[in-house]
UniProtKB/Swiss-Prot annotation:
Changing Y160A: Decreases binding affinity for betaine aldehyde; increases binding affinity for 4-(trimethylamino)butanal. The record marks N159 as: Transition state stabilizer. This is Aminoaldehyde dehydrogenase BADH. The catalytic activity of the dimeric betaine aldehyde (BADH) from spinach does not require potassium ion as cofactor, contrary to the tetrameric BADH from Pseudomonas aeruginosa (AC Q9HTJ1), although both enzymes contain potassium-binding sites. The gene is BADH. The modification Blocked amino end (Arg) is found at R8. Changing C450S: Loss of partial inactivation by betaine aldehyde in the absence of NAD(+).
Length: 497
């Protein structure tokens, strides 16, 4: 489907500005491999201009020093404007990222919902200011202020381009911070378009600045900038480590939402067809490009044969097509680089002795685009690369277990700790498994539902900190203790001269 990509510049201080070095990055439609436009390529010089604008906006009295209720009016206006322009954003997200149109619809709905939710959090912040602290000495009284951290750098990924940027923008702005957003260069179009929304609702200049560009050229200078007070990053564990190391030089706080290799544990007492659908959804949703993808299937040995047989039948029924086609449930992966990486994972699995039970190739009916069949890999050992490393593509590996203890051990056999799913009709067993799983989120009898009201984040090498919910806004607040002596009496520690 042909759809024009708007020609945009960098969004700095409420204006569209050409990059200082005037470079551009081509936008490639992953469904066709065709160049459909370009985006500006920011460098360290542009980062400097954007950070100065954000700091100036933070020091003005029309944002950070205002009430949460005042900021909430802007967040609600943004939510309304996103809803008004929903069709435009959905089309751009689909053509830029390759995700199925129906998924992009849900994403953009969630963008609006996220701004609406954090508008409420901004208002709630007003009621929490000057919260009293009970002290053991009557001559003192104490309270707590919740104040914005300052200028924050937000680095977002390409799998949910505008939505995961929103997970950072909305709470940061609700808290009263000003921000510089650096989205992934692989899918930046909707994030740039968001700058136009900011202007349309009258967001004060400099409150949000949007820089597209390559990680080393724009992301790294943002992380290391001495006038950026915090970094919130979503991306790979390897890049997250670099972000953390760079920020550490300035003792700069970071929140990191990184990779995963999440397990899905299926016990013998389940409705197999129901769980099979959740299994393919948990791994193949968003074209398999989900940090929380439950890509390690652990199924009880007593039902494994029947389960895997139905798994293949359901997987064969997935419609793989141009993302704009009605009923599309699997589109292309994001780029040629990602395509090659996934195919290398599959070939390595074969060479290590695994069986590609289904898929593993380009769909025969799609000659162009970065399409990969949904792939099921069996005969897995825990030493294999496919078991240990994040693929970030539509690849599911399958292993059996015989006992609850074995299931827990296999599920936790990973350096990651983002999410996990457990399926059983025995809810007491589900509760035991939930407590034992070393992750930040557990789905019981489902996989992947995510709500703005609930916290999101991982442990181990999946990062730290929590986005969304009431925890999301806390990432962007400084908690300040204020203690006052209310006695007329002298302190009396030293002898009076």
């Amino acid at each position: 489907m042909a759809f024009p990509i708007p020609a945009r510049q960098l969004f700095i201080d409420g204006e569209w500005r050409e990059p200082i070095k005037k470079n551009r990055i081509p936008v490639i439609n992953p469904s066709t491999e065709e160049i459909i436009g370009d985006i500006p390529a920011a460098t360290a010089e542009d980062v400097e201009v954007a950070v100065v604008a954000a700091r100036r906006a933070f020091r003005r009295n029309n944002w950070s020093a205002t009430s949460g209720a005042h900021r909430a009016t802007y967040l609600r206006a943004i939510a309304a404007k996103i809803t008004e322009k929903k069709d435009h954003f959905v089309k751009l997200e689909t053509i830029d990222s390759g995700k199925p149109f129906d998924e992009a619809v849900l994403d953009i709905d969630d963008v609006a919902s996220c701004f609406e939710y954090f508008a409420g959090q901004a208002e709630a912040l007003d009621g929490k200011q000057k919260a009293p602290v009970t002290l053991p000495m009557e001559r003192f009284k104490s309270h707590v202020l919740r104040q914005p951290l300052g200028v924050v750098g937000l680095i977002s990924p390409w799998n949910y381009p505008l939505l995961m940027a929103t997970w950072k923008i909305a709470p940061a702005l609700a808290a009263g911070c000003t921000a510089v957003l650096k989205p992934s260069e692989l899918a930046s179009v909707t994030c740039l378009e968001f700058g136009e929304v900011c202007n349309e609702v009258g967001l004060p200049p400099g409150v949000l600045n949007i820089l597209t560009g390559l990680g080393p050229d724009a992301g790294a200078p943002l992380v290391s900038h001495p006038d950026v007070d915090k970094i919130a990053f979503t991306g790979s564990s390897a890049t997250g480590s670099k972000v953390m190391a760079s920020a550490a030089q300035l003792v700069k706080p970071v929140t990191l939402e990184l990779g995963g290799k999440s397990p899905i544990v299926v016990f013998e007492d389940v409705d197999i067809d129901k769980v099979v659908e959740w299994t393919i959804f948990g791994c193949f949703w968003t074209n398999g490009q989900i940090c929380s993808a439950t890509s390690r299937l652990l199924v009880h040995e007593s039902i494994a044969a029947e389960f895997v047989d139905k798994l293949v039948k359901w997987t064969k029924n997935i419609k793989i097509s141009d993302p704009f086609e009605e009923g599309c449930r699997l589109g292309p992966v994001i780029s040629k680089g990602q395509y090659d990486k996934i195919m290398k994972f599959i070939s390595t699995a074969k060479s290590e002795g695994a069986t590609i039970l289904y898929g593993g190739s380009r769909p025969e009916h799609l000659k162009k685009g970065y399409y990969i069949e949904p792939t099921i890999v069996t005969d897995i050992s825990t030493s294999m690369q496919i078991w240990k490393e994040e693929v970030f593509g539509p690849v599911l590996c399958v292993k059996t277990f015989s006992s609850e203890d074995e299931a827990i051990a296999l599920a936790n056999d990973t350096e990651y700790g983002l999410a996990a799913a457990v399926f059983s009709n025995d809810l007491e067993r589900c509760e035991r498994i939930t407590k034992a799983l070393e992750v930040g989120a557990v789905w019981v009898n489902c996989s992947q539902p995510c709500f703005v009201q609930a916290p999101w984040g991982g442990i181990k090498r999946s990062g730290f900190g929590r986005e969304l919910g009431e925890w999301g806004i806390q990432n962007y607040l400084n908690i300040k203790q204020v203690t006052q002596d209310i006695s007329d009496e002298p302190w009396g520690w030293y002898k009076s001269p």
